[in-house]
């Protein structure tokens, strides 16, 4: 089934996609890559259905051929390329950051040109190489060679592809919850409970006057006292 490879049935599309499930049966599917289906949106879906820059797939391909669409500053030629949570999507002069709201929906929010230069990447794991170099692997599939000390779960902030800041996953850091019951919430870490064995590590964070708990793997450090980027519409 040719349609099945590039498309999925709307009713089977991830719940995180903010789409109308009752129109055409099929919806564009992301190409496999750095992001899972539920944590990213295909570029074609963003520019056609969600933001309405174009009305047809033919128009989408035309705009891509004009070399005006970028994700995190890199040119996009394929409409199936996924843009994930906190990625920056540039369409001509307009910039958007993909956020996840408290209903668990992925939403592109408009940001200014200065903010569009800020890219946040979370450390997934590290690999020691010969010499003193370490390969830092990020959750978006990219990597970096470095001699600096970065831990799994930390965030590295890039500006114009240069490292601007290192945000540590620790008590007092500001985090954004990407999944689970507390999805979309932003708060300050109160406690990290490292678990051994089969139990996952947990994070207790404070938002306003309330404390919440979530899995450590669901949190993304976004600042020290306030978020460095737009996280709400």
Model-assigned labels for residue ranges:
Residues 1-233:
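Ferredoxin-like alpha/beta domains used as RNA- or RNAP-binding modules
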